[in-house]
């Protein structure tokens, strides 16, 4: 297995940024779309619950409809080659004896994981559906991080979007998928301008060594 050397890693980490405008003429190839989808699918999650569903929007009219319900991101979304809608599962779907969890794992894995997961729901969450919902969103955001970094490895760009009306965007999508519960959006494409210099805390402020 080959790994990026330190120089290439640092360059990639510094070049990745929240792209605020994309090349509207750039169209993803089917290979690129499949690769982005696979990056999303392979994302890690606690107990391997994978409590998400990814909707890849490439249809320009549909992107435009969704963009109309974003806050200050309309032109950026319309310029993107694709828009990934990250949907979260509902807490009821993650109950240990429900259909989703019972059919998610191979039998040999299920007999080991399900009892432990059920115990965690009681000990950590006190069987609170609200806490379980927060847990589900945490897993979705882990996937979002992997997607954005993976897209950078492909030489492409992204922007995570939290500013949108989830109910209105859900209404746009409801004709095509069943009542989506939307965690966030990710605009995807090719940048039209170089990223500005990255601004981050110093190592002293950001990291404590013990």
From Swiss-Prot:
Disulfide bonds: none annotated. Keywords: NADP, Oxidoreductase. The keyword Transmembrane does not apply. SUPFAM superfamilies: FMN-dependent nitroreductase-like (SSF55469). Its EC number is 1.-.-.-. GO terms for molecular function: oxidoreductase activity. The keyword Iron does not apply. It holds the Pfam family Nitroreductase. NADP(+) binds at residues 150-155. PANTHER family: NAD(P)H NITROREDUCTASE YDGI-RELATED, NADH DEHYDROGENASE_NAD(P)H NITROREDUCTASE XCC3605-RELATED. Reduction of a variety of nitroaromatic compounds using NADPH as source of reducing equivalents; two electrons are transferred. Belongs to the nitroreductase family. This is Oxygen-insensitive NADPH nitroreductase. It comes from Helicobacter pylori (strain HPAG1).
């Amino acid at each position: 297995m080959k790994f990026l050397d330190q120089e290439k890693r640092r360059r990639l980490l510094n070049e990745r940024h929240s792209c605020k405008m994309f090349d509207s003429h750039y169209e993803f190839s089917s290979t690129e779309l499949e690769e982005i989808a696979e990056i999303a699918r392979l994302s890690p999650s606690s107990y391997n619950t994978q409590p998400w569903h990814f909707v890849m929007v490439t249809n320009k009219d549909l992107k435009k409809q969704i963009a109309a319900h974003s806050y200050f991101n309309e032109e950026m979304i319309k310029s993107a080659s694709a828009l990934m809608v990250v949907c979260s599962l509902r807490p009821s779907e993650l109950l240990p004896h429900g259909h989703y969890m019972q059919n998610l794992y191979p039998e040999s894995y299920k007999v080991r994981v399900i009892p432990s997961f059920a115990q965690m729901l009681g000990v950590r969450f006190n069987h609170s559906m609200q806490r379980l919902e927060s847990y589900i969103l945490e897993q979705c955001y882990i996937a979002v991080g992997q997607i954005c970094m993976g897209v950078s490895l492909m030489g492409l760009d992204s922007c995570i979007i939290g500013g949108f009306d989830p109910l209105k965007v859900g209404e746009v999508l409801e004709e095509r998928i069943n009542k989506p519960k939307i965690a966030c959006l990710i605009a995807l494409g090719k940048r039209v301008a170089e990223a500005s210099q990255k601004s981050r805390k110093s190592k002293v402020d950001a990291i404590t060594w013990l």
